[in-house]
Structure formats: structure tokens, C-alpha cells
From Swiss-Prot:
This is 1,4-alpha-glucan-branching enzyme. GO terms for molecular function: 1,4-alpha-glucan branching enzyme activity; cation binding; hydrolase activity, hydrolyzing O-glycosyl compounds. Signal peptide: none annotated. InterPro entries: A-amylase/branching_C (IPR006048), Branching_enzy (IPR037439), Glyco_hydro_13_cat_dom (IPR006047), Glyco_hydro_13_N (IPR004193), Glyco_hydro_b (IPR013780), Glycoside_hydrolase_SF (IPR017853), Ig-like_fold (IPR013783), Ig_E-set (IPR014756). It comes from the Eukaryota. CDD domains: AmyAc_bac_euk_BE (cd11321), E_set_GBE_euk_N (cd02854).
Amino acid sequence: MTGDNNDIPENVRGVVEIDSWLTPFAKVLSERRYLADEWRYKIEHSTNSEGRDTTLAQFARDAYKSFGLHADPGSLEIRYKEWAPNAVRAFLIGEFNSWNENANEMQRDEYGIFTTVVPPVVDDSGNKQYGIPHDSKVKVCFQLADGSRIYRLPAWITRATQPDKETAKQWGPSYEARFWNPPVHYSFKNKRPGFMRDTDSLRIYEAHVGISTPEPKVGSYKEFTQNVLPRIKDLGYDAIQLMAIMEHAYYASFGYQVTNFFAASSRFGTPDELKELVDTAHGMGILVLLDVVHSHASKNVTDGLNQFDGSDHQYFHSLASSRGEHPLWDSRLFNYGHFEVQRFLLANLAFYIDVYQFDGFRFDGVTSMLYLHHGVGEGGAFSGDYNEYLSSERSFVDHEALAYLMLANDLVRELLPDNGITIAEDVSGYPTLCMPRHLGGAGFDYRLAMALPDMWIKLLKESRDEDWEMGHIVHTLVNRRHREKVVAYTESHDQALVGDKTLAFWLMDAAMYTDMTILKESTPVVDRGIALHKLIRLITHSLGGEAYLNFEGNEFGHPEWLDFPNVNNGDSYHYARRQFNLVDDPLLRYQYLYQFDKAMQTTEKNYKWLNTPQAYVSLKHEVDKVIAFERNGLLFIFNFHPTESFTDYRIGVNEPGCYRIVLNSDKHEYGGWDRIDESQSKYFTTDLKWNERNNFIQVYIPNRTALVLALDSRVRNGN
């Protein structure tokens, strides 16, 4: 599509030059970018703590360093600051003042920001100490205009814990805020791993600390550091995406009903133990991403943000409007158009980057944020028509939420200019979401390729293997917006939840309980399952995106779904765990899938097909069920046929020379049949065009087998 370049606003000209189909919508794109830029201008020309103009990064840092409770090691004073515009008076209470509601009244300014200072105290030895002991309980008491008083956990609290049984019995199960100020603060030992945004691969291991143990219990940060990090390192992943870190009172919410945004979940341990986890990962060369939830918040009142100052519209849209709560999630929705909400959320990002040394974020629920209909109902039926996103009449975009996301990406770039990573969980395919801000995009590095797991599950549920359409598989895997990177995956935590099945269970079902032992001959069901598990993951990894994600346990074919303890399962932890004992057992076949996943990650690390231009697909043979493509100088060949193996099968390839196998899914150590003698397998090109490539090779490709080949000159020792 063409248009007069002079009519395109300068601030979005970059994205329009990349995608000419955006031309009719250039004005809309420009207006949306302008709103974010206007917000940024307001922020940068607000005054900082020294009374000067500020930067976006300084604005966010000043916020988390001033709001909430902060100890001054010089004066031993503790300062507390809170925004609560609906309150007329405020009091800091806690164990330190015997919960005296009138002992520590706060000062209110014209914006509804309350402040107070707790002076040091003198102990029995005559030594000055902080007026609030470390890890002691605190609350804030607000007096409203009608004289009534309400009690809340400080909004910026950095530690909140479950009450003991006696307290819960007397006062209820609401979480308790604690003043975290240890005598010795954790000191990071390792630098962040380097990451070149434009060239480096990203192989992500998605994990949940609490379920990262074979035992039916809540796992800890320390256990994850000691037991799971070495597995991730061994497999060859270079990033971890941690779920459920932000405090959530309801464990079964999977961490997506956040109550305390600045508090790392105390179920798993202390803040210092989380810091040690991140630090240890960095020492292994592994980036750590936080699954951040800024799309909504828990409806909890006494231990959450909901009705924090007695009103229903402080941090959120009013319940009197249609925008106050999510229609499906039973949660509150942020008002991204409010200055203090922007401050709170941006500061939250800076806090996790600075204090815990996270290297970036996976933003949950971006589709819900982007649209007033939240992607629910008819509004969520996206066809890809640009009018659905960019037409002022049809798009229903929440401009303020989009502006916030742009600012969030700006902030991450400022704080981590070299290696900060942002990933959007967006199913809608919003154009320009993953284009740079300076070109007119929203600034995310990647979006999740959410259509891919849906395709695989649909095929496994509804089609026989012999009916799989190679063209459909390829189209789904490569169908992404030009110059917008995606994270490919076959299954994430979403596919593991109760009511669904893991990929391995779709393939092998009940046979996983009876036929995975190597002490008896393998069955056709298990043979098929292991073979297709490898092919599906490798073709998704190599063709489906510019980064790759695996949910913990699925690398070895974890058999069971996830179900957190709740009233419907008798508060059982049986399914709220990862059975690493299965892959550790040398008598079970899970080890084969683990070893293949390790080989797949290692091969990508050595030859780097991720974060390179899309593959050239030369073959999609519907009868033979063969797919072939080239990416970054590698040749990938997949034979999905259930029964047919092919000898001297012609495969087109562009570069002439001698090719050798660098990854073979049929090796015995990966649960295959060793039908290819790799020591005798060198494939020389013939100088004749084939399938629109300049040359071809002839290969033996067994059924349900995948091969990756490289020019002999590129093959590394040990592949």
C-alpha cells in the first residue's frame, strides 16, 4: 500500500516505512504516540526531590525510594510516605507503638500525600536504635471524612506475610505487613549477564518457585537456587522467567491476583533469598525476567490496593463505570490515566530492576490492557484487519493503557540500555507493539506467539497424524508481523493448568503411568509420543520465532497438569509440584526427552538460528509429510509421516558444499532408533536447482524424525 510520505507524521514515519499497510492509520498511530510522549514530558518536567526537572528513570527511582517505609542509617529515623487522597487523617501503627492509633499521626499535603518520621529510640544499654524493629508488623490507619477509621497494609510495603494460625483465627487470614530492615543487607556478587538485544538468542525457562519441588509442598527460593538453577544451566537455557513473585494472598491464583506489588512473595522465603537466587543465576550467565502483573490487581481490601483510602477509584477506575473491574478475572483495573498510578507502576518496575536485579519483564495480560473490551467476547475475535486495532471507530483501544506500556518500555531502556528485555503477552496481534519507540512503536522486544500452542493442541485433539497439513503447520509457525519478534513455544503454564493437558500427556495419555520404564519393550503409543514431542518442540523452536520458551518440567515431558491447593481439591499439593524425580530415574524414558531438549538448546547456542531473519521454507510436502527450510545457514528437515521413511530424498539447499548432521532426533540417547549412521553421513550438494534452491542434497530421513544439518566448515567439535 502506498501513500504520500509527506502526509505521514514524523513521529511514526519509521514504522510506516517498515509496514506500508500502516499508512492509512499514520495519524492514529501518531496521536497514540503523542499521548505517551506528552505523559513523559509531564513526568520529566515535574520536580524531583531536589526541586529540579527529572528523567523518567529518576522519577521512578525517586518514587520507590521515598514512598513507603525507609530507614535512614545516618539518623536512624524511619520515614513513611503514602498517597491516600480520600483520607483526612492518617496514622502509622504497629507493634513498635503497641498499635496506638494516635501515637504517630501523619502530615497531609494538598495532594493527599501523607508523611511522618519515626525517631530513633534508646535501648536499655543507652544505644540508639531504629524506632521500628526489623520484621515487626505495621499498618496504616486512615480516618475518613465521616469520622470512621479503616486499616490497611502500606501500599509500598516490601514484605507481607501470612498470619499464624492463632492470629488468623482471631483476626482473619489477611496478610500482615512487616518492616523489612535487616542489620546486614544482601550484597550482589555477580554482574548481570551481557545481552545484545539485536543479535543474541533468548532461550527462556519459565518457572514458578513454589511448585519447583517433587514434594507436595511450597518450594522455597533456596531450594530453587540449589536444585533447579543447576538443571536450567545444564539444559542450556540463558534466561529464566519467574512467575508469582509479586505477593499474592491467594496461592491458587498462580500469582496473578497481586495484593502487594513491592513485596516479593514470602511463601517462598525472604527478600534476601530471592536476591541470592537472582545473583546465583547471573553467576551462571542466566538472565532473570519477572512476570509482572500490571494489567489488574486483587480485589482484596484489607491486604491489597482495593479501596485503599476508602474510595473505589484511587488506583483504579470507579466501580460506577464499566471499567472498574475485569469481567472474567474478578479483579480491579488500573486507571492508567492518573499521574499517581503511573508513578506507582513505573516505580514498581524500577524497584525490581534495582533492588532485585531483574533483567526485564514479561508483561501479563497486555491484551486486556490494550482494549476497553479486554479481548473478551466479540471484541476478542481478532481477524488481523488493521481497522480492529487502528480505526478510531472500531478499535476500542485504551489509549492511556497503551501510553503507560510505551513509558514502561522507555523506562526499561533507560535503566537497562544494553540488556533490558520486555515481552508482551498479547494474543490480539496489535501492530507496532514490538517495534522500537523511536520509530513510533510501543517498544516491546517480543510478544508471545500464543497461536502456536493452540495449533498443536488442536491437531493432537482433532486430527490423525496422517491428516496433518504441513502447509497449515508452516503457515501458523511463520505467521508473524514483519520486524516484530515473537517468543515461540509449544506450551507454557497456561497449557499445564488443571482441565488441560501437557503436550506429553496429549501424546501418550495414561501410557505415561505404565509404559515409560525401560525395563520393558516400548509401546507404539510411547514411541509415537516421544518422537512427536521432539519434532513439535524442534520445529517450533527453529521456525516459530526469534526466542523460545519452555515451562519447567515440560522439557522432559512432565505428565500431569497443575492444580494449586484449593477447596475443590481438599487443599492438596499433589498437582502443585514438578516431578523432577521422573527425569532423575535412569530406568524411565523421561531422560530421553530431557537429553534431546538439552541438545536442542546447545545446538541453538552453537549455531544461533533464533534472533535471525525468518527461515526460507523450500518444502511442505503434504503426501510425504516432509518439511524443509533453511535458517541462518542451517538446513532443517522434518519427516512427520507416521510410517514412511525415505531414502535418497531430495532436499533443496542454497549454499553448495558438504553438509553434516548437527542434531538428529532419532539418536538412541533421545529415545530414537539410531537408524542413521552419522559417522558415515556426509551430504554433498548437486549443482542443480531443486525447490527454488540452487542445489540439492539427498538424505535418508526416517519416519517421525528431524535432522539439522550444517556445512562441514561450520560444524563445531561435539556439534
